[in-house]
């Protein structure tokens, strides 16, 4: 498009004359395009590969979407909120899925707390209905089962890191104390994991006799036990040490070995065996 610049002092009659000339039909021009026009056309042609359709705005945005970046660069390239957004799938009217993901993380305080939430914890949250609740809960359960499967493949005493990861995912962020038994076979491979006691923030009743009875029923040769401290502090209490001694001695009467007792927090664990207390 061409623009005509009119100076402030230009004669009005000249303006009318130009108007009459503009109204007359213009003769076809055979003028050769200017060098500037040719250069502009050449640059425009060079910017677009021959035969390729022009890149659309949607295509350019697609390169920046989390799904595309995950497939191209791996999941480590995404933030916590972006990974949660992929699970949620879509947002709400006026709020995109990324805003919803950030809201969820802020509501629960951390990614671990979000993924450890029970189905009832999502009730009343705008944008999180039964379908999305099921997806979030299922993802964590799949991770737990994968770690348990890994624990069954080799002796647990040979892979303490796998035990730590499994226990932190299992009970590390529970809001109440939970006592867990990992029943092992003669080769110290995982046979079964069971929660044998539940308590409050500071108190829990554990019955060694019931644990021994269950170990015999599963034909277990050894046990690893664990409980969480909701406070996050993993230093064992005097009651924890006393329970460990009682349980170790009760299992020894039926020739079952207590290999370790873990105290589990959200980001750390304490091993009685490593401390030399078993």
Swiss-Prot record:
Family classification: Belongs to the UPF0758 family.
Instruction: Indicate, by first and last residue, each region the UniProt record lists as having compositional bias (Low complexity).
Output: 22-59
Identify the species of origin: Burkholderia mallei (strain ATCC 23344)
Q: Does the keyword Protease apply?
A: yes
Query: Is Membrane among the key words of this record?
Result: no
PANTHER family linked: DNA REPAIR PROTEIN RADC, UPF0758 PROTEIN YEES-RELATED
Q: What is the lineage of its organism?
A: Bacteria, Pseudomonadati, Pseudomonadota, Betaproteobacteria, Burkholderiales
Region called Disordered, residue ranges: 1-64
Tell me the InterPro entries matching this sequence. MPN (IPR037518), RadC_JAB (IPR025657), RuvA_2-like (IPR010994), UPF0758 (IPR001405), UPF0758_CS (IPR020891), UPF0758_N (IPR046778)
Which residues does the record give as Zn(2+) binding sites?
A: 227, 229, 240
Motif range for JAMM motif? 227-240
SUPFAM superfamilies per UniProt: JAB1/MPN domain (SSF102712), RuvA domain 2-like (SSF47781)
Q: What UniProt keywords are attached to this protein's entry?
A: Hydrolase, Metal-binding, Metalloprotease, Protease, Zinc
Q: Name one Pfam family in it.
A: UPF0758_N
Q: What is this protein called?
A: UPF0758 protein BMA2230
All residue ranges annotated as the MPN domain in the record: 156-278
Q: Name one GO biological process term.
A: proteolysis
GO MF terms held by the record: metal ion binding; metallopeptidase activity
């Amino acid at each position: 498009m061409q623009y005509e610049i009119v100076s402030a002092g230009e004669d009005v009659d000249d303006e009318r004359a130009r108007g009459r000339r503009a109204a007359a039909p213009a003769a076809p021009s055979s003028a050769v395009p200017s060098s500037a026009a040719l250069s502009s056309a050449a640059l425009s042609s060079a910017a677009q590969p021959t035969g390729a359709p022009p890149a659309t705005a949607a295509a350019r945005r697609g390169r920046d979407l989390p799904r595309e970046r995950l497939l191209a660069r791996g999941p480590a390239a995404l933030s916590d909120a972006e990974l949660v957004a992929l699970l949620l799938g879509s947002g709400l009217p006026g709020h995109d899925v990324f805003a919803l993901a950030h809201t969820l993380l802020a509501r629960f305080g951390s990614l671990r707390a979000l993924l450890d939430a029970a189905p009832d914890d999502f009730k009343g949250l705008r944008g999180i209905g039964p379908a999305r609740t099921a997806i979030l809960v299922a993802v964590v359960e799949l991770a737990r089962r994968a770690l348990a499967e890994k624990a069954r493949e080799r002796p647990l005493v040979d892979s303490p890191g796998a035990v730590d990861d499994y226990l932190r995912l299992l009970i590390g962020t529970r809001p109440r104390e939970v006592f867990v038994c990992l029943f092992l076979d003669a080769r110290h491979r995982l046979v079964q994991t069971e929660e044998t006691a539940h308590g409050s923030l500071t108190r829990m009743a554990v019955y060694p006799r019931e644990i021994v009875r269950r170990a015999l029923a599963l034909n277990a040769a050894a046990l690893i036990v664990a409980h969480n401290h909701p406070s996050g502090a993993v230093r064992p209490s005097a009651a924890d040490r006393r329970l460990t001694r009682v349980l170790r001695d009760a299992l020894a009467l039926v020739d079952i070995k207590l290999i370790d007792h873990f105290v589990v927090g959200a980001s750390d664990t304490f091993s009685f065996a490593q401390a030399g207390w078993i």
